Regions:
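Glycine-rich phosphate-binding loop of actin/hexokinase-like ATP-binding domains
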Residues: 180-221
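Nucleotide/phosphate-binding catalytic cleft detector across ATP-hydrolyzing
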Residues: 2-183, 201-203, 212, 225-227, ...
């Protein structure tokens, strides 16, 4: 894509390749197949654009990603002015609190507590001590390592690893929604991602290993092939359906059978 002066992205080319056999619940489980897929996409894009591609942005998410609260405390012998250096040191200390086999992908700054007052920006305030509160987004260390390995083998430098779900929330949520408080839910890629915002800050994030594929499997329980169930879900599935709505005709299946729309929608709505 090409970034426009107003910040919008102009799509120059788009390539899609199936990945269900080696990416499960947002995690790579076969590095060789992932590398081959990335190489194929790179080659096709270069052929379409007639340009060499050397770097890429890779959205990260998937099962196991969640937030962990952390507090960093600093006490001073006397009341002192909080400087940028003090705040930077607190942030660095927070990033050093890597929790075991997990790593911090992003540290979301919450409030700072200085005595009895709470501030978003403590610089310039005198205090005898300061508490920095952080919400760390963590995931398994292998997630980043596997992504870098696959794309390096495909001849691509990973420029950045934005958290896909948060990038989507930033585009879809308004400022007033984040200020007043809201829950943002995204279902897809065999997972359901949930984020809570309040006072313009992320307050909680979790990725649940249940998603759209579970709906597809429920539909397949009507003796329908998984491929056809996925197609029907995309075409007819609704998050909300009123059972007394008689305007929908039965859904025709490839084998000549038909399914009542009520039965189909009941399966979809039960998951949502």
């Amino acid at each position: 894509g090409r970034k426009q002066p107003d910040g919008a992205i102009q799509i120059l080319a788009s390539i899609q390749e199936p990945s269900a056999s080696f990416i499960r619940k947002g995690r790579i489980n076969n590095l060789n197949k992932m590398t081959s897929c990335a190489t194929l996409i790179k080659d096709k894009l270069e052929k379409t654009l007639k340009k060499t591609i050397s770097g890429c942005y890779v959205g990260v998410g998937g099962m196991g990603m969640h937030t962990v609260e952390n507090t960093v405390v600093r006490h001073f012998p006397d009341k002192m002015l909080i400087t940028n250096e003090v705040v930077d040191g607190i942030r660095d200390n927070n990033l050093q609190s890597q929790p075991g086999e997990r790593e911090i992908l992003e540290a979301v700054q919450q409030e700072y507590k200085l005595g009895a007052q709470t501030q978003l920006d403590p610089v310039g305030i005198q205090a005898e001590g300061i508490e920095g509160h952080f919400l760390n987004i963590v995931t398994n260390r292998r997630v980043r390592e596997d992504i870098y390995t696959c794309f390096r083998e495909a001849g691509l430098q990973v420029i950045d690893l934005p958290i896909t779900f948060l990038a989507l929330a930033d585009q879809m949520l308004t400022g007033p929604e984040k200020r007043s408080g809201c829950v943002f839910v995204d279902m897809g890629a065999e997972t359901t991602s949930v984020a809570v915002f309040k006072n313009n800050l992320l307050r909680h994030l979790a990725v649940i290993p249940l998603g759209g594929d579970n709906i597809t499997r429920d539909i397949a329980s009507l003796q329908i092939e998984h491929r056809e169930a996925e197609q029907l879900k995309r075409e007819y599935g609704k998050a909300y359906y009123e059972a007394d709505d008689e305007s929908h005709a039965p859904i025709s299946l490839e084998d000549g059978r038909s399914v009542k729309y009520d039965d189909f929608s009941g399966l979809v709505q039960a998951r949502l």
